[in-house]
Amino acid sequence: MKTREEMVNELFKIKIPAGLINYIAKKERSVLGAGTMNSLSKMNDQAIRSLYSAIIDDKEERDDYLLIRTTMWLVSEFQSAKISIDHPVPNIGDFRIVCLNEDDDIIVVVDCKMNQYEWNQIDEFISKLRILKEREMKLTNAFVVSRNADASEIVNKLKDVQGMGSDGTFVTKEKQGLGGLVGGKPNKINFSMLIEKS
């Protein structure tokens, strides 16, 4: 097993978002420093082990394994975005992970969990997306991420969701023109359900 110092050095070489470091430090009741290296150096052993086992070793040892892996994937996909975990949105609720642009506009929302999703959880997420898109016009992507789940039943139900296209485009609301006629550009989000396999 690697020493704490070796783990910190390996983690420092990876671009770990500040939002993830803050989340793990808070969860493990660890102190933080200013900047990534300072924060990693000051984090307690459990926090370092959590990050290391999920990011470097790819070991599913903890409940937040998928959250850590998903966050790291988002960093590679949306490189200039800031990450926020358990992000509160007034009058809508919390989103598990969001990516924010430089103006703090929400551009990506993600819900992830280790176990199988129930349809009511997906339906609730979709309802929150409809409301959020009305406020956050820069929102372009939404992901539901699960681990080793059978998603066939949920995928079949997604086909029946109003505005959900077979190509993954989710139209949250048609824009209304003059006299209530449909016109203008609709509110669209790229919606994907991802399954991480072990």
Which residues fall in each region the model found?
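Intrinsically disordered, low-complexity Ser/Thr/Pro/Gly-rich regulatory segments
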Residues: 1-198
